[in-house]
């Protein structure tokens, strides 16, 4: 019997709706990966509603929970760590210590960092010290880095002006330590407005992928969290980087189609679960000669 992969997912949780672990854990489990959720915050709902209740997990709880898993002899079974929204820079440093602890018992374990830096215009608020931590510390530890365009620009200290510029900026991030950079959403000047574009860059190759951009009255939250989780899960299931890239784009598109059909602000993960596992659509990533 083929072994089921395990990963530790350390990011936010919302009681209502889908963001952070609430967007990523179920889809990862649905496609065959045993996700262990460790929630950095527990909020009533995501912050783009403009009001919420809840609290941030005390940073000391992260190593305590990792230690608890170690004490029952299960930490060595962890194949990867995924981190996303952080409530504080202290949480981030606790996560890096956890990654180090896991890699000590499983050197093959991967660390995917989704460097959520916030988007104040959309109501996504991240403390300034978190962005500084991500820029200065997390990128050097990550095996897989999954920024969006805003975060890519922040890492590189300038705004991308073209697709080629995005590729070069992603390559510059590889020099900090990651094996691969997945840019979840490209937003460079001159791109096709009716297309949603993504980029995957390794030391050897770069791939560009387009899918239709679906219209919503309000853009659903949690798409990036879903993207990072599915990509890491497919890698753990044996996909190559580009296979995981293509699968993720298709599965996320299926979720968005169902969400659009339901006229919902929240991702329709349960309704779309079979399409997540077996997408009906396929988008081919184009190898770039750049």
Curated annotation (Swiss-Prot):
Binding site for substrate: 12, 47-48, 225
SUPFAM superfamilies with a match to the protein in the record: Ribokinase-like
Any GO MF annotation of the entry: magnesium ion binding
GO cellular component: cytosol
Pathway: Cofactor metabolism; pyridoxal 5'-phosphate salvage; pyridoxal 5'-phosphate from pyridoxal: step 1/1
GO biological process: pyridoxal 5'-phosphate salvage
Signal peptide: none
UniProt KW keywords: ATP-binding, Kinase, Magnesium, Nucleotide-binding, Transferase
One family name in Pfam for this protein: Phos_pyr_kin
EC number: 2.7.1.35
Record: residues binding ATP: 114, 151, 184, 211-214
Source domain of life: Bacteria
Alphabetized InterPro entries for the sequence: PM/HMP-P_kinase-1, PyrdxlKinase, Pyridoxal_kinase_PdxY, Ribokinase-like
Cofactor: Mg(2+)
Enzyme class: transferase
Catalysed reactions listed for this entry: pyridoxal + ATP = pyridoxal 5'-phosphate + ADP + H(+)
Alphabetical list of HAMAP family matching this protein: PdxY (MF_01639)
Assembly: Homodimer.
Its biological purpose: Pyridoxal kinase involved in the salvage pathway of pyridoxal 5'-phosphate (PLP). Catalyzes the phosphorylation of pyridoxal to PLP.
Family (UniProt): Belongs to the pyridoxine kinase family. PdxY subfamily.
Name the UniProt record assigns to this protein: Pyridoxal kinase PdxY
